[in-house]
Amino acid sequence: MSKSHLLKYLLISPNLPVGGFCYSEGMESYLHNKNLIDSNSVKDLIINELKIGQIRLDARLLLDFFDIFDEINEGKNLKGNLHKLMSLDKWILSSKDTLEIREQQIQMAKSLFDLTKEFGFEYLCKNNKKSSWPLAWSWACYCFKITKLEMIENFFYSWSANQLSAALRIIPIGATKAQLIQRDLLAIISKVSKEIMDKEIDDIYFGNVGLAMAQQNHNDLYTKLFRN
């Protein structure tokens, strides 16, 4: 088994590499409005996000970031590629609907950059203190030589695992139910990942009005951050 194949497990762990925390991303609002009542409703929420949520756009940008890193490594159009990298990063970060979600992204990105630095890979734009989570994820996968498809699959898996970790604390659904949901999500994660591979950014449709409204209450609810 290759080293890169083993390193991907470090990335997808619900406890690592981002300091053993996960964010509920507005899940409490769904609970407050009685839209989350059991494991089935949690599963449906996560599936809907995988099918039409903004997480799809985040996943698609992983590919663009990955290709830019590749061109920079080959010495192609350094100035232009760095500008494109920064522009895409600022764009995806600004697309987040609330300050809390943007700060969450920055926090998680910093933790992942710290991890890759410990492995000997210092990020190209180290002076940029406000990067997005997708950028940091793509950088880690590029450094660890993880394939593009695995990069997207792992991204979706890690995101869904964190949502389930949050659900365990606020509903709760129970650890066994959470594991069963994660198992049931594998097929949709595989399907959606392959779809993302074949699409351009402009072809990615997402509608997250419900999630955006839920996140508006993020700063007023008591369980926005969990530490393991």
From Swiss-Prot:
Pfam families: UreF. It comes from the Bacteria. The keyword Chaperone applies. Disulfide bonds: none annotated. Transmembrane segments: none annotated. InterPro entries: UreF, UreF_sf. The keyword GTP-binding does not apply. It is found in: Cytoplasm. GO terms for molecular function: nickel cation binding. UreD, UreF and UreG form a complex that acts as a GTP-hydrolysis-dependent molecular chaperone, activating the urease apoprotein by helping to assemble the nickel containing metallocenter of UreC. The UreE protein probably delivers the nickel. Required for maturation of urease via the functional incorporation of the urease nickel metallocenter. This is Urease accessory protein UreF. The gene is ureF.
